[in-house]
Amino acid sequence: MIGISALSYDLEQKISLFHEYKDIEFIEYGIDEATDIEALNHHMSKKENKDIKISIHLPLKTNLVEDIGFLRDANFNYVSNIIREVSYLKPLYFNTHLGNVFYSKYTSNYKNYIQKANEFIQRLLVEYPNINIYTENVYSFLNQASSDLCAVGTKPIEFMDLFEIANNKSLGFCFDLGHALIQDEDFSNVIKNYNSMLHFNLNDKTSDQHLGLSKTGKYTKKFFYELIDKYGFSYIVLELDSSKAKETIEILELNKL
């Protein structure tokens, strides 16, 4: 299934693209705060939108590896409330980043934080046994030991270890191509061994630009379809702004309604 990403400020434009192209089958909607849910409810209450399939990108600040108990519980309760409030839409899946922690603490007790992420996810899956969760690779420019916060989920081994510990078919991997380009990591073993979806966006490997396909050069329609054929992703999300999404859709020659 091919979908497009949306945030509250461009949801209306993305809904228009959904209605224009029959090959766009769902919208992955990013939620950070309550007003984002209100915007989603407003648009989904309209008769013409009742057939739109939705998936949810959980808040970017969701921190599955938080080690301060009070903050961890608050984080969990907030995420749980979001899932509860959008459950009437029967989302295809929920996507999340793993979070962040002090670099020195993470490198000295790595397995402890992977276990914390697992416990957070398993707790959600117990509370909501019918949902599917995908965990997304991210990038970090921090490359040496320091007291700074580092992003968790930049390397394939982190996901391999998490999925081995979790051993749960409701948990999958969201491969963000743009993040992998910046991080310069090969996630092929994770994708091949676990249920995986794709966030499709491109960049020049220096910043998270969220560029789309081009008609010439390296990243063309051929590149896209070879990637899809190679890995057989469960879901594919064009994680692009409205104009770049439309350009990429036209390059892919997706069918209109």
Q: Language-model features: where?
A:
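Active-site acidic/histidine proton-transfer and metal-coordination neighborhood
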Residues: 71-171
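Active-site-proximal loop/turn and secondary-structure-junction residues that shape catalytic pockets
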Residues: 8-10, 31-35, 58-62, 98-102, ...
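Short amphipathic alpha-helices and their capping/turn segments at secondary-structure boundaries
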Residues: 36-50, 78-89, 116-126, 184-194
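N-terminal pre-domain/capping segments
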Residues: 1-84
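Hydrophobic faces of well-ordered beta-strands that scaffold small-molecule active sites
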Residues: 2-6, 25-29, 54-58, 94-96, ...
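Glycine-rich, phosphate-binding/catalytic loops in enzymes
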Residues: 21, 45, 72, 111-113, ...
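Histidine-acidic metal/acid-base catalytic patches
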Residues: 16-17, 76, 90-92, 102-106, ...
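A general structural motif
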Residues: 1, 22-24, 49-53, 86-93, ...
